């Protein structure tokens, strides 16, 4: 409503203008926010409508660094590089993202997935000869991550991550194929941990350690150290322990600054169904041994369960695999490449199955039989496991004497009928081994702990050891069944007349 007073009209109009200006500012702000939201939605819509990006492997520059050779979708292509891409980041083997026009628009990381292959040999021009799990060999290029800014190049035997279609290897997988079959750490077993095998320890000390500790004397007498040692005998009697103790002793003798190595080859895991794979793995093991033996460092290659790999050729006991595996080992032992500072130690409880060519002088020169422990040796083994710091209910000497007397008592187990008509009684004592004694002591300790918890008495007692011996005799898995009577003679380590029949007698338990 207009008034006659001009001043009031002016004030009213100014208020109206101010309100309209404020409303207009709010509308402008809302319009701007709507436009921004619409722009975001439009961008999202465009992103959703955009074609999918593809990825490829950058191989090399071409055309004066203006184009790139890229392997993508199973095809080798030459593509343009977007100006937004930093060309310094484009290194061989890196993953790149391709735009709608098949243009390199983004540099990604080096590929982290692919197939595994073993490097056989390094070639010129950053290439390598690889072998896959089927035994097929091919040549691939090594990505920049393997050749640029690294302390050392990949070596033969390394496991590589490869893309066989692109023809590139991207990464060294830390676990080499040799390390999957072997353990290079020096064991912590010492001669003091082995009981009842003093004569065998002395023999292997003379055969293995003297050449490394007295090299000047060996050269003066023009005497070459043995290439290998065979430890054979019944199972569970300390063959593997001796080999580990030798490696530990060598490490102690030569000092911390020049360590020794113990390559423990897991025999059955060497076997492979593909032709030539087992032989190739043996070559890799000896290549690794020669590499470690540089600069005079002693290396022990220990083959456990040796008969599983190197059986007599033409025996018909297994497949024809041994006809090529045995010659491969003989080649490594007698080959042109020297095995200096490398000692082969083999362990087996079936020495009759090993090919004689491996056992002849000049190969496995020293053969040491590891016998089952007698009463005195058994006392020594018990003493290794019943140490002074272990709680006992009576003197340790008394415990050991009572246990040994019970273990070696006249307790018949089986009657063997030989082919000449004679018979032989085997007692439980004929099956005693160091591993069995260790298990007996562990059983006794467990019984002592249970008695201590029950509040009866504290410490290992003779009754615990005797109960453990009885339980071990009853449950021992060392004894074969009677379906093959000759197994009884083999398991106790006797060789003579063939067994025609075995009759279980049982015994006092």
From Swiss-Prot:
This is AAA ATPase forming ring-shaped complexes. Homohexamer. Assembles into a hexameric ring structure. InterPro entries: AAA+_ATPase (IPR003593), AAA_ATPase_domain (IPR050168), ATPase_AAA_core (IPR003959), ATPase_AAA_CS (IPR003960), NA-bd_OB-fold (IPR012340), P-loop_NTPase (IPR027417), Prot_ATP_ID_OB_2nd (IPR032501), Prot_ATP_ID_OB_N (IPR041626). Belongs to the AAA ATPase family. One of its GO terms (molecular function) is ATP binding. One of its GO terms (cellular component) is proteasome complex. It comes from Corynebacterium diphtheriae (strain ATCC 700971 / NCTC 13129 / Biotype gravis). ATP binds at residues 236-241. Gene3D superfamilies: 1.10.8.60, 1.20.5.170, Nucleic acid-binding proteins, P-loop containing nucleotide triphosphate hydrolases. GO terms for biological process: modification-dependent protein catabolic process; proteasomal protein catabolic process. The gene is arc. NCBIfam families: pup_AAA. Residues 11-50 form a coiled coil. Keywords: ATP-binding, Coiled coil, Nucleotide-binding.
């Amino acid at each position: 409503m207009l008034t006659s007073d001009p001043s009031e009209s002016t004030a009213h109009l100014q208020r109206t203008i101010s309100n309209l200006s404020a409303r207009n500012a709010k509308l402008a702000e809302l319009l701007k926010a709507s436009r921004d939201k619409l722009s975001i939605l439009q961008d999202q819509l465009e992103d959703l409508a955009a074609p999918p990006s593809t990825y490829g492997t950058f191989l090399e520059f071409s055309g004066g660094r203006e184009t790139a050779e890229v392997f993508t979708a199973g095809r080798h292509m030459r593509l343009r590089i977007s100006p937004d891409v930093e060309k310094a980041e484009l290194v061989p083997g890196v993953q790149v993202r391709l735009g709608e026009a098949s243009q390199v628009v983004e540099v990604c990381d080096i590929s982290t997935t692919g197939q595994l292959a073993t490097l056989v040999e390094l070639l010129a021009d950053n290439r390598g000869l690889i072998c896959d799990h089927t035994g097929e060999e091919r040549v691939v290029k090594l990505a920049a991550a393997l050749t640029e800014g690294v302390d050392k190049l990949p070596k033969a035997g390394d496991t590589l991550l490869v893309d066989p279609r692109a023809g590139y290897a991207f990464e060294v997988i830390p676990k080499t194929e040799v390390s999957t079959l072997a353990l290079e750490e020096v064991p912590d077993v010492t001669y003091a941990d082995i009981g009842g095998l003093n004569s065998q320890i002395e023999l292997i000390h003379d055969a293995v350690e003297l050449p490394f500790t007295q090299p000047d004397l060996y050269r003066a007498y023009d005497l070459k150290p043995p290439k290998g040692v065979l430890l054979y005998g019944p199972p569970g009697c300390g063959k593997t322990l001796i080999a580990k103790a030798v490696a530990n002793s060598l490490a102690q003798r030569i000092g911390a600054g020049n360590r020794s190595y113990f390559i423990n080859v897991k025999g059955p895991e060497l076997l492979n169904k593909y032709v030539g794979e087992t032989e190739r793995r043996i070559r890799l093991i000896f290549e690794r041994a020669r590499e470690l033996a540089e600069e005079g460092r002693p290396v022990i290659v220990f083959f456990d369960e040796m008969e599983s790999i190197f059986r007599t050729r033409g025996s018909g006991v297994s497949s024809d695999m041994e006809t090529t595996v045995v010659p491969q080992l003989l080649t490594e032992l007698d080959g042109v490449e020297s095995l200096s500072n490398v000692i082969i130690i083999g362990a087996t409880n079936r020495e009759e199955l090993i090919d004689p060519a491996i056992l002849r002088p000049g190969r496995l020169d020293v053969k040491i039989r590891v016998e089952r422990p007698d009463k005195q040796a058994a006392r020594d083994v018990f003493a290794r496991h019943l140490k002074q710091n272990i709680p006992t209910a009576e003197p340790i000497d008394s415990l050991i004497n009572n246990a040994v007397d019970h273990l070696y008592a006249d307790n018949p187990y089986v009657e063997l009928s030989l082919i000449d008509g004679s018979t032989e009684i085997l007692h439980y004592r004929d099956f005693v081994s160091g591993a069995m004694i260790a298990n007996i002591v562990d059983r006794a300790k467990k019984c002592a702990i249970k008695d201590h918890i029950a509040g009866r008495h504290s410490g290992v007692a003779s009754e615990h050891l005797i109960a453990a011996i009885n339980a071990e005799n009853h449950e021992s898995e060392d004894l074969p069944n009677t379906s093959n009577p000759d197994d009884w003679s083999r398991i106790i380590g006797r060789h003579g007349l063939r067994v025609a029949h075995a009759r279980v007698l049982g015994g006092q338990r």
